Curated annotation (Swiss-Prot):
Molecular function in Gene Ontology: ATP binding; metal ion binding; protein-exporting ATPase activity
Protein's name in the database: Protein translocase subunit SecA
Function: Part of the Sec protein translocase complex. Interacts with the SecYEG preprotein conducting channel. Has a central role in coupling the hydrolysis of ATP to the transfer of proteins into and across the cell membrane, serving as an ATP-driven molecular motor driving the stepwise translocation of polypeptide chains across the membrane.
Assembly and oligomerization: Monomer and homodimer. Part of the essential Sec protein translocation apparatus which comprises SecA, SecYEG and auxiliary proteins SecDF. Other proteins may also be involved.
Pfam families the UniProt entry points to: P-loop_SecA, SEC-C, SecA_DEAD, SecA_PP_bind, SecA_SW
Keywords: ATP-binding, Cell inner membrane, Cell membrane, Cytoplasm, Membrane, Metal-binding, Nucleotide-binding, Protein transport, Translocase, Translocation, Transport, Zinc
Keyword presence, Cytoplasm: yes
Membrane topology: Peripheral membrane protein
GO terms for biological process, alphabetical: intracellular protein transmembrane transport; protein import; protein targeting; protein transport by the Sec complex
EC number(s) reported in the record: 7.4.2.8
Length: 1029
């Protein structure tokens, strides 16, 4: 139906292109007039455009500056601050509107200038990544279309080889004229540096500065690169610098400018594939115990071994029963138990490829899945643990729990976690216990709860490590380290680690060194980071299939740009085989056929293991070939460059080499161009389209096909039932192949199912992070305000006003004068005296006013004796130190909340709603603590003596050592909020390059006791159980 409408009314993309085509004509008309200009005259035109643009926006910038200056006034009132902030918000909105209108006006002339600059550069030789390059690019009309779409804040889909890198120069140049900075985001450091060096002649011609952010750069280098008009870098580097800027100790430590305009190259990879992976800066957990996994590991190995024996028995039973009674339900049940116990068992997969077996097992599964899987426990109870491969979940059964409890010897109640609330209530109500005994008993309950919970968590993670994660598929082991393999590119992700102890569990499994645990100090998801940009756009060769998600999450429209020359690549229907063995044999046969012909072939694989299997088979046939996977990524550029030569055979995991075009060698066009052979379908149609897109660039000939088997993961989990049925009916023999458009469509439907599932996970992740994002926004704004102001006196006095009212209210019910006086002395070190009768007569309001005045006088006296610059430092230290400490604690509490929130679903409660409510309570509580402790610190801090200064310097050295141990991670968290809970984590990409001296810590005049210290009032109780309540 949709296609009929498109034929009548035209497609959305046709309409999009039709709207902007007149702009292209205008650009070309202006471009034609520039031919007679000298280089200096052309430069003068770009300078004039920049100057005029800046002049148009000067007035509004000045208004903004004047208003911001008023906020520095120490005597400003809260109502005045709120009024000024409202005006600033209105001004910012107006500024963005005027900037957009001004850029729209100069777009045709600016694009014409860039196009003419490219023409003038033709034949210019220069160095790119130590290779000599000759400029030979002038934007085509379709590239101008792409540039306009990017400037409009949309995603442009352009086929491979259409020159997306050149397209980005057009909107980057235009938006750089604002002086607000443009960020061009790429997928790795190599492409960031290459693209910057490759495109720099266009910008340098007009004096526009370009920079690049690379991992390993020091803060001062980063600051210099960000100061450029255009900065290239990866999403990780931009994101981590944002987080580090929000941990900075002084304005001089900030490296980034504003987030004005971002252009994301390979936008689907960055905004979709990476979207399940939050950016995290973490620090080490003190006294972390890494031996806990080695204690449990022998138990787990025995459990897994017993399960394997159990599954082998069920398979033997199924074989035996089927021989006697082909359709017996007992055989079907045995097969189902084998599948639930070890779904990737080689013998099971082979049996299911036999005629009728998969259908037999499916009949049993359908029976037990009825009524929301109500009877599935009957299947699972006979196993030690069950695996649901589709949802990546694993569940220990009662049989498994009993087995592990026996192995633990001393702990027969291993799986009984105490109900802390009930236990504590019982202790509190036990009148036979004195205070000390109660404290001791409570500590025992907490310790038992903590020990049991941790042990159960470690058992769960080790079970996943042994049953769900496979070496050379999900990860590789290199140089004694477990390294995650990117499922989309096949590349190793250096330093990226799984979270919640899963990575340590895999390290224990593989007998390598178990690294220490870390705790989150700052975090943001990719989605919420890129939402910071005032304007965002992106480009890729494959975005149309993800257009709904790009619009839903980022409000990015997708526009498909027509190719400069028609694509003539032949995309064949899939070849479907019953077993992997048959499929691999067919692939090798096809490669030999193509090599004899001289036609280059690129074989795409989904894992390191498959690429090495095919490589072994080719070596056995003495076929010369190259392998590009996570283990052999060092020669990537060289291998990709030679993949289009006559007779070349290249095996590459997924899209390794993406971002580099494969150019055809001499005579290859006549042979049919590059032949793409996919060894299996990926979960995402987009990844398959990317693989096909390696061939047929710029109108070159080419061919693509996928070889699929019913044993492939995608087919096994989501798509094989109908295809198996067809094969069984046709009586297919070994080696036979199905090739039909209906089968290809069936496979694409299976892919769509997985895509929808992954989208829901990413959307759920965003819904959870949106809660934290609003809180992060409040905290970071407050922190940045404190960081950039010279004095924070007005903020301190505002806190004092609220404190006075709240504290007086607290003691007003019983007119507890002594309690009030002691509280003020503890909190502010202020001697506040008031008679009991006065307290009663004056009431709350007047008493609060007296308290405010007394504290104010104390603070003013302090200002009289402490130099203004030092007072500014004291206030800033108080605010920043407390915010950072409390935010870290809050993140830890939020992590704990996330871990157990899904269990609320068992109580018929929506986990997300519960999470929002709990997170809000935690946030409100944290804000109260921040305000109270900030005020307390500001009053108690005084300049240091010389003796104390030496002590502080020693502490600073310790602090710097801890700072250097911070790591930036890009957490791999696709199941972070799912019941499966494996939360594959994150990226310990590099040390955090803060490189900053910590703020000088003044001496605290009156130290509040620690929560477990004896209370200073002399009661003999701990502080937390007495005055610290």
């Amino acid at each position: 139906m949709l296609k009929i409408f498109e034929k009548v009314f035209g497609s959305k993309h046709d309409k999009d292109i039709k709207k902007i085509k007149p702009l292209v004509d205008e650009i070309n008309e202006i471009y034609a007039t520039f031919a007679s200009l000298s280089d200096d005259q052309l430069r003068a035109k770009s300078m004039a455009l920049k100057s005029n643009l800046q002049e148009e926006l000067t007035l509004i910038r000045q208004q903004n500056s004047d208003l911001s200056g008023k906020l520095e006034n120490p005597d400003i009132t809260i109502s005045q601050i709120e009024s000024i902030n409202r005006e600033l918000d209105e001004l910012e909105k107006k500024y963005e509107e005027e900037t957009a209108a001004a850029l729209e006006k100069i777009l045709p002339e600016t694009f014409a200038i860039v196009k003419d600059t490219c023409r003038r550069l033709k034949g210019h030789t220069y160095q790119v990544m130590d290779h000599t390059m000759t400029w030979d690019m002038i934007p085509y009309d379709v590239q101008l279309l792409g540039g306009i779409v990017l400037h409009q804040g949309k995603v442009t889909e352009m086929a491979t080889g259409e020159g997306k890198t050149l397209v980005s120069t057009l909107p980057a140049f235009l938006n750089a004229l604002t002086g607000r900075g443009v960020h061009i985001v790429t997928v790795n450091d190599y492409l960031a540096q290459r693209d910057r060096e490759w495109m720099s002649p266009v910008f340098e011609f007009h004096g526009i500065e370009t920079g690049v952010i690379l991992s390993g750069m020091r803060p001062e280098e980063r600051k210099k690169e960000y100061a450029c008009d255009i900065t290239y870098g990866t999403n990780n580097e931009f994101g981590f610098d944002y987080l580090r800027d929000n941990m900075a100790g002084s304005p001089a430590d900030l490296v980034q400018k504003e987030y004005y305009y971002g252009i994301v190259d390979e936008v689907d990879s960055v905004l979709i594939d990476e979207a399940r992976t939050p950016l995290i800066i973490s620090g080490p957990v003190p006294n972390a115990n890494t031996s806990k996994f080695t204690e449990i590991k022998p138990w787990m190995e025995r459990l897994v071994k017993n399960q394997q024996n159990l599954v082998a028995g069920y398979l033997a039973e199924a074989e035996k029963v089927v021989k006697e009674k082909p359709n017996d339900f007992q055989a079907a049940l045995a097969l189902l138990r084998a599948k639930r116990g070890q779904p990737k068992n080689t013998r099971l997969i082979k049996m299911l490829s036999q005629t009728g077996m998969a259908k037999l097992m499916q009949s049993a599964e359908n029976e037990y899945l009825k009524d929301n899987s109500r009877r599935m426990h009957e299947v699972d109870d006979e196993l030690y643990f069950s695996i649901d491969e589709k949802s990546n979940a694993i569940d220990l059964t009662d049989k498994g729990r009993d087995f592990l409890s026996k192995l633990s010897n001393q702990d027969s109640d291993l799986f009984l976690v105490p109900d802390v609330g009930a236990e504590i209530a019982a202790i509190e109500s036990d009148e036979a216990l004195d205070t000390e005994q109660k404290i001791k008993k409570k500590d025992e309950v907490y310790r038992l709860f903590s020990d049991r919970s941790e042990k159960l968590h470690n058992i769960s993670q080790l079970l996943k490590a042994y049953s769900l994660f496979e070496k050379d598929d999900d990860y590789v082991v290199q140089n004694g380290q477990v390294m995650i393999v990117d499922e989309f590119t096949g590349r190793i992700l250096p330093g990226r680690r799984y979270s919640d102890g899963l990575h340590q569990a895999i390290e224990a499994k593989e007998n390598v060194k178990i690294e220490g645990e870390t705790q989150t100090l700052a975090t943001i998801t990719i989605q919420n980071f890129f939402r910071l940009y005032k304007k965002l756009s992106g480009m890729t060769g494959t975005a149309e299939t993800e257009s709904a998600e790009l619009f839903d999450i980022y409000k990015l429209d997708v526009v498909v740009i027509p190719t400069n020359r028609p694509i003539i690549r032949k995309d064949q229907d899939d070849y479907v085989y019953k077993t992997r063995k048959e499929k691999y044999a067919a692939i090798i046969g096809k490669i030999i056929e193509l090599q004899k012909k001289g036609q280059p072939v690129l074989v795409g694989t989904a894992s390191v293991d498959v690429s090495e299997t095919l490589s072994r088979m080719l070596r056995a046939k003495k076929i010369t070939h190259n392998v590009l996977n996570a283990k052999q990524h060092g020669r990537e550029a060289e291998i990709v460059a030679s993949a289009g030569q006559n007779g070349a055979v290249t095996i590459a995991t997924n899209m390794a080499g993406r971002g580099t075009d494969i150019k055809l060698g001499e005579g290859v066009k006549e042979l049919g161009g590059l032949y793409i052979l996919g060894s299996e379908r990926h979960e995402s149609r987009r990844i398959d389209r990317q693989l096909r897109g390696r061939s047929g660039r710029q109108g070159d000939p080419g061919e693509s096909i996928f070889y699929v088997s019913l044993e492939d993961n995608l087919m096994r989990l989501f798509g094989s039932d109908r295809v198996i049925s067809i094969m069984d009916k046709l009586g297919h023999e070994e080696g036979d192949v199905i090739e039909h458009s209906m089968v290809t469509k069936s496979i694409e439907r299976a892919q769509k199912k997985v895509e929808e599932q992954n989208f829901s996970i990413r959307k759920r992740l965003l819904e959870y992070d949106d809660v934290l994002n609003q809180q992060r926004d409040v905290i970071y704004k407050r922190r940045k305000g404190a960081l950039t102001k010279k004095r924070l006196t007005a903020d301190i006095f505002d806190l004092l006003h609220d404190y006075s009212e709240n504290t007086v209210n607290q003691y007003a019910r019983e007119f507890d004068v002594k309690g009030l006086e002691e509280q003020v002395l503890r909190d502010l070190s202020v001697e506040f005296r008031i008679e009991s009768i006065t307290f009663e007569n004056e009431g709350v309001e007047k008493t609060a006013e007296q308290l405010y005045k007394a504290a104010l006088e104390f603070y003013k006296r302090k200002e009289d004796v402490v130099p203004e610059e030092i007072m500014g430092q004291i206030e800033k230290y108080a605010v920043l130190n407390v915010i950072d400490q409390k935010w870290r604690e809050h993140l830890r509490e939020i992590d704990s909340l996330k871990e157990g929130i899904n269990l609320r679903a068992y109580g018929q409660k929506d986990p997300l709603l519960e999470y929002k409510q709990e997170a809000y309570k935690l946030f409100v509580s944290m804000l109260g603590e921040i305000e109270h402790e900030t005020l307390s610190l500001a009053f108690k801090l005084f300049p240091v003596t010389e003796e104390a200064r030496e002590k502080i310097e020693q502490e600073q050295k310790k602090s710097q050592v801890q700072q250097d141990r911070l790591v930036a991670r890009h957490e791999k968290a696709e199941t972070a909020y799912e019941n499966s809970g494996s939360r594959p984590e994150g990226r310990q990409e590099k040390k955090a390059e803060n490189g900053k001296e910590p703020l000088q810590q003044p001496v605290i005049a009156d130290k509040t006791p620690g929560r477990n210290d004896p209370c200073s009032c002399g009661s003999g109780k701990k502080y937390k159980n007495c005055c610290g309540k």
